[in-house]
A protein has these predicted regions:
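PAPS-dependent sulfotransferase catalytic core
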Residues: 1-72, 83, 87-91, 100-106, ...
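A generic "structured core" feature
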Residues: 1-19, 23-30, 84, 92-96, ...
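Acidic-and-aromatic substrate-binding clefts and catalytic sites of carbohydrate-active enzymes
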Residues: 39-47, 71-77, 134-135, 163-167
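Generic structural signal for well-ordered alpha-helices
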Residues: 49-53, 81, 144-145, 260
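PAPS-dependent sulfotransferase catalytic domain
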Residues: 82, 90-95, 102-163, 170, ...
Length: 276
């Protein structure tokens, strides 16, 4: 059993909210793990199709879906669109985006809290691998280029995070129409802020949880149990992240300007509220 639709990103743009709202739909079977990362060669591709199929219920008529923001991080994880097209050629794709600068800043905070920026020096951050890793995920036009080589524009639904916040039911109705199921009322928005919770979990525990051993142990318990454990652990004092300077924001706007203009042309959406 392979997915009928895939939320391909972008990171820190509401993919968890989409995943949870779709999980509550009676005609949808979302993957056991929200982020299967199956089509990422550097992550779970080696586990094979049997493992991936096991993320979904073995039978039934419900639409199957998953949500892996790493599917739109081509700088670090190339080849994802080709693998999806090979095994799920008829999949409906969903790509939710937000202000590219705000998204990059949110990913920066998230990465810092996970310990991915332990050697961070803000004086030399611009131009570093960490900088390009974060900015690349906001190059929305570049990220969908390879997808549009294998899928039609009609197969790709582009959503705006701010519209999801302002009109959640309308956006979810767009999603259900795109994947071919009846609309379903949502119970509020339920925006999920990982970083706010992560900031209160002790750093050593976070590092273990995101290690291969930690992920393997997490597979042994239900999603509801994992949420309860994380909520229990998130009782400490919130850790602070380094300030994001106006100069750094200006550099990101400069570096993303051309790509963002091209994204507007591809999608036909103006995204007038964005900083770039």
């Amino acid at each position: 059993m392979l997915p009928d639709f895939i939320i391909i990103g972008s990171m820190k743009s509401g993919t968890t909210t989409l995943y949870r709202n779709l999980s509550a739909h009676p005609d949808v079977d979302m993957s056991r793990e929200k982020e299967t990362d199956f089509f990422v060669a550097e992550k779970n591709w080696r586990l094979g199709l049997d493992w991936y199929s096991g993320q979904f219920l073995p039978q039934g008529t419900r639409k199957r879906g998953e949500a892996s923001p790493n599917y739109t991080k081509s700088r670090d994880f190339p080849g994802v669109p080709e693998r999806i097209a090979q095994h799920c050629p008829d999949a409906r794709l969903i790509y939710i985006v937000r202000d590219p600068v705000v998204r990059a800043e949110s990913q920066f905070r998230h990465s810092f809290l996970l310990g991915a920026l332990d050697d961070l020096d803000m004086a030399t951050f611009e131009g570093s691998h960490g900088y390009h890793h974060i900015v690349d995920a906001s190059r929305y036009a570049h990220q969908i280029d390879a997808y549009l080589e294998h899928f039609s524009k009609e197969a790709l639904l582009i959503l705006d995070f701010d519209r999801l916040v302002q009109s959640p039911q309308m956006v979810m109705d767009q999603v259900t129409a795109h994947i071919g199921i009846a609309p379903h009322p949502i119970d509020g928005l339920g925006l999920h802020n990982d970083s706010a919770q992560l900031s209160r979990v002790p750093a050593p525990i976070l590092r273990f949880a995101h290690s291969s051993t930690g992920r393997a142990l997490a597979d042994l318990v239900s999603r509801e149990t994992r949420d309860k454990i994380r909520g229990f652990l998130a009782k400490g004092k919130a850790r602070k992240t380094p300030p994001f300077s106006d100069g750094l924001r200006a550099s990101i706007r400069r570096d993303l300007s051309a790509d963002t203009d091209r994204f507007r042309k591809i999608t036909g959406q103006d995204f007038a509220h964005w900083q770039v």
